[in-house]
């Protein structure tokens, strides 16, 4: 791990990237739709050609540049997995684990022959319950092997003391994406609930229950999940960290919710010596105690049976997996067919043994020069953000000083971790069923989680994504930004591209993650990662006033007839998109001011910067997925990450000659002006 500090002198450009005759534009003109005017629909103008050339296939609810790169990575990972599977490796070796797990998922003949037999012991454990007092201990036993329950628990950073881990208890127990799916009464949502009820009935029947039994159990499940959802915080409410922070002593927890046997629950989970914890969502957990007290034992059993059925739905027969896809894939997202089995198998291996694949992936596909280039880019972006902070006339010197301190202590992680996860204690046994191996892997993960975190300080070297992941993140409690190797490829990053391309793509990604440290959530954490106020009262008021502009703007965007974007839900990501563009353009200007880039293919460097940014968000999406994402995703839809964000960037207007006559025009006084 390396800490990168802002230099006192302005960083220069990226060496060869500003050598005119060596580096390339990398803007693919075929991606454009020049029949569209930039000021009318910039998303279509910049990406319409790509959309036309990449229509949605039946396996996708949405497909964009992120997905295209993930497909490329998939092919690379597939080759690595097949190499491991082809080796005659010793039992217990990493190669054996990778190869046998992949082969188990691929072996549909065996899984179909086994039917539901692999999970019958779990179902029998649930059915054998005689007293309500057995529910919580059973839930703990199930939880440690990957079967969900009425709520969730885990060990994570204490936001008030970022060096310490603490136990947390969180809302959970529902199988629809958000609480609104249980309560909204528009026709589309009511139809989704009806389809969900059908799905539950069909799944119980596939596990051997009669139609009458399945229908009765479905009603019990829906009643309990609806009660749980009603007490959940919404995603918007959860964006306020303090809404999910209620620290108390263990004795206070027992007094607050006496209807749950906490000693037995945590003893089974291997967590002992609890002194204090965070009851993140008290109303939801109180409702669990009320449900156990008020509902008939038969209903509680039906609910726990459902948790087994749902949690194992992709581990058994093709018929059960297809039934699950029909609801979650088709009804909720609009997909027509499942992905090929090899992709599903690869995703299982990648999700369960990610660091094994990550180490192989980095060795073969991530050149050291890419890490060096990214390190320089990050330094340049940090300098630019410092300049942007200084340029904010609305902010006091006191708050600016604290902002610089936070920026100067960013931890930057690029490419891959310095240490890899150890899987030596995990057994993948091909003599057992795939479902039984899933239980083993889940228990391994839980025991590893407890061993590494309970009673231990926060590991600031920990990575929260594998190197092959096509994404990036900012973690406020460690004040770190992370860019895995997987995203450091075209169309985000290209070693042979000029600065206009790289600053417009990966530069904005870097700036986006940096801005998260100063968005409506991140600004509430200090340089050490603690939830602490470092703003003057007046500056905080001005920040909230300014960001309300973008909330109101996105609230007015109609993403489907009768469905608007949620400006509050997406506020943090929208601020980060805006900040990423502002910071990266500043860094781009710094890098090229002494060595300006030429016009290429009729586009100025500034135009290529914004085309490169927009190209990252090229994609197509189904209406069902638009509805699902609008209700549940903190990110704006790709179209609006272009058409909703660029109209708030003054330099974009200059680059493309946008005027008040253009539909995307936003008066300057109504534009977001922050960072």
Over which residues does each language-model region extend?
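Positively charged n-region of N-terminal signal peptides that target proteins for export
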Residues: 1-4
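Hydrophobic/aromatic-rich, well-ordered segments within soluble, folded domains that form packed cores
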Residues: 31-52, 182, 186-205, 571, ...
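Short, Gly/Pro- and small/polar-rich lid/capping loops
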Residues: 20-30
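Active-site-surrounding "flap" and adjacent substrate/cofactor-binding loops of secreted or lumenal enzymes
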Residues: 34-40, 45-110
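Noncatalytic, helix-rich "gating/capping" subdomain that lines the substrate-entry/channel surface
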Residues: 84-376, 380
């Amino acid at each position: 791990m390396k800490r990168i500090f802002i230099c006192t002198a302005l960083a220069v450009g990226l060496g060869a990237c500003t050598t005119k005759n060596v580096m390339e534009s990398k803007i693919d003109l075929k991606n454009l739709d020049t029949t569209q005017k930039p000021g009318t629909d910039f998303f279509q103008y910049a990406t319409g050609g790509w959309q036309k050339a990449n229509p949605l296939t039946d396996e996708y609810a949405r497909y964009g540049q992120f997905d295209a790169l993930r497909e490329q990575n998939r092919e690379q990972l597939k080759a690595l997995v097949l190499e491991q599977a082809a080796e005659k490796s010793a039992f217990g070796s990493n190669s054996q684990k990778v190869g046998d797990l992949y082969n188990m998922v691929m072996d549909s003949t065996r899984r179909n022959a086994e039917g539901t037999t692999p999970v019958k012991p779990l179902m029998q454990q649930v059915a054998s319950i005689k007293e309500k007092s057995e529910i919580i201990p059973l839930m703990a036993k199930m939880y440690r092997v990957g079967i969900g329950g009425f709520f969730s628990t885990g060990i994570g950073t204490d936001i008030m003391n970022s060096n310490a881990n603490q136990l947390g208890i969180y809302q959970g127990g529902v199988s629809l994406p958000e609480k609104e799916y249980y309560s909204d009464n528009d026709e589309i949502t009511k139809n989704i609930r009806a389809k969900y009820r059908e799905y539950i009935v069909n799944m119980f029947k596939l596990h051997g229950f009669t139609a009458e039994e399945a229908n009765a159990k479905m009603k019990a499940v829906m009643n309990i999940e609806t009660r749980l959802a009603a007490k959940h915080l919404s995603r918007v409410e959860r964006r306020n960290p303090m809404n999910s922070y209620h620290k108390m002593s263990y004795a206070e927890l027992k007094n607050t919710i006496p209807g749950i046997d906490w000693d037995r629950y945590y003893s089974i989970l291997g967590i002992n010596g609890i002194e204090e914890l965070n009851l993140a969502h008290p109303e939801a957990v109180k409702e669990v105690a009320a449900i156990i007290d008020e509902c008939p034992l038969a209903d509680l059993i039906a609910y726990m049976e459902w948790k087994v059925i749902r949690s194992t739905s992709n581990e058994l027969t093709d018929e059960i997996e297809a039934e699950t896809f029909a609801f979650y894939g088709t009804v909720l997202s609009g997909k027509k067919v499942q992905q090929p089995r090899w992709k599903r198998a690869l995703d299982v291996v990648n999700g369960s043994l990610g660091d094994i694949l990550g180490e192989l992936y980095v060795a073969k596909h991530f050149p050291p020069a890419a890490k060096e280039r990214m390190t320089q880019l990050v330094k340049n972006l940090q300098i630019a953000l410092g300049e942007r902070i200084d340029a904010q006339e609305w902010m006091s010197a006191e708050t600016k000083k604290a902002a610089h301190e936070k920026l100067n202590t960013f931890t930057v992680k690029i490419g891959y971790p310095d240490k890899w996860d150890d899987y030596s204690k995990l057994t993948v046994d091909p003599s057992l069923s795939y479902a039984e191996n899933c239980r083993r892997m889940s228990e391994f993960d839980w025991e590893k989680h407890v061993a590494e975190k309970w009673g231990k300080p926060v590991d600031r070297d920990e990575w929260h994504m594998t190197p092959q992941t096509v994404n990036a993140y900012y973690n406020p409690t460690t004040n770190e930004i992370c860019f895995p190797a997987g995203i450091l490829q075209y169309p985000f990053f290209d070693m042979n591209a000029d600065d206009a391309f790289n600053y417009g793509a990966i530069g904005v990604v870097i700036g986006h993650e940096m801005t998260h440290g100063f968005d409506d959530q991140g600004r509430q954490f200090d340089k050490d990662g603690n939830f602490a106020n470092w703003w003057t009262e007046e500056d905080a008021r001005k920040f909230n006033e300014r960001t309300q502009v973008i909330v109101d703007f996105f609230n007015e965007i109609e993403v489907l007839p009768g469905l608007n974007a949620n400006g509050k839900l997406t506020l943090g990501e929208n601020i980060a998109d805006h900040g990423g563009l502002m910071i990266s353009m500043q860094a781009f200007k710094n890098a090229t001011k002494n060595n300006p880039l030429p016009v290429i293919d009729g586009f100025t460097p500034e135009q290529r910067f914004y085309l490169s940014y927009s190209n990252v968000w090229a994609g197509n999406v189904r209406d069902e997925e638009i509805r699902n994402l609008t209700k549940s995703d903190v990110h704006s839809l790709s179209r609006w990450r272009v058409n909703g964000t660029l109209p708030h960037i003054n330099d974009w207007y200059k680059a493309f000659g946008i005027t008040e006559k253009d539909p995307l025009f936003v008066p300057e006084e109504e534009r977001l002006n922050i960072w």
